[in-house]
Amino acid sequence: METFSSKDLALQAQKKILSRMASKSMVNMFIDETSSEILDELYRVSKEYTKNKTESQKVIKNLIKIAVKIGVLFRHNRFSPEELVLAKDFKNRLHNGAMTAISFYEVEFTFEKDVLPEILMECKNLVLRLVEKHLTPKSHGRIQHVFNHFADPEMLSQLYDTKSSLRPHLQKICNGLNKLIEEEKL
């Protein structure tokens, strides 16, 4: 017997459309102002560190696509109770990671090169488990790309170096993270 669901078809179409719309102009529809500012700073950090504008744009575009797709899945109640536990674990781990990133910034000489990459890899694994049954292998690749990019220990070391040209971006990122935490969005 053929299983057809217009709801599933509509969700699939919506995800497809959203995957094509993840550009900076569309971010404002799905991501709040503070998050958008953080994404802009992450782009600048990536571009300055890699010296590769195209790669930096791609990693931010992939991050936006994944965030939007997960948001669509969540809004359409597509996650099982077990997957919702994974989502909560991810949110908690991301919150702890943000607190750690802020602490490393605010308290000089506390940055440990391996801590943030480890947290980001844990977050990546949770997201991959969360979307395993919902998104395509191409989307899984995007998740890998984003987390692997920002978990680069050398990039993070430069970001936290008090004499680095990346440091002003870190201040803006941490200010944004603090705001999201205060507003209980992260």
From Swiss-Prot:
Protein origin, superkingdom: Eukaryota
A Gene Ontology cellular-component term: cytoplasm
A single BP term in Gene Ontology: negative regulation of inflammatory response
Keywords: Immunity, Innate immunity
Summary of the function given for this chain in its UniProt record: Acts as a negative regulator of innate and adaptive immunity by maintaining immune homeostasis. Negative regulator of Toll-like receptor and T-cell receptor function. Prevents hyperresponsiveness of the immune system and maintains immune homeostasis. Inhibits jun/ap1 and NF-kappa-B activation. Promotes Fas-induced apoptosis.
Entry-linked PANTHER family: TUMOR NECROSIS FACTOR ALPHA-INDUCED PROTEIN 8-LIKE PROTEIN 2 (PTHR12757:SF4), TUMOR NECROSIS FACTOR INDUCED PROTEIN (PTHR12757)
Annotated domain remarks: The central region was initially thought to constitute a DED (death effector) domain. However, 3D-structure data reveal a previously uncharacterized fold that is different from the predicted fold of a DED (death effector) domain. It consists of a large, hydrophobic central cavity that is poised for cofactor binding.
Family the UniProt entry places it in: Belongs to the TNFAIP8 family. TNFAIP8L2 subfamily.
Protein name: Tumor necrosis factor alpha-induced protein 8-like protein 2
Native source species: Xenopus laevis
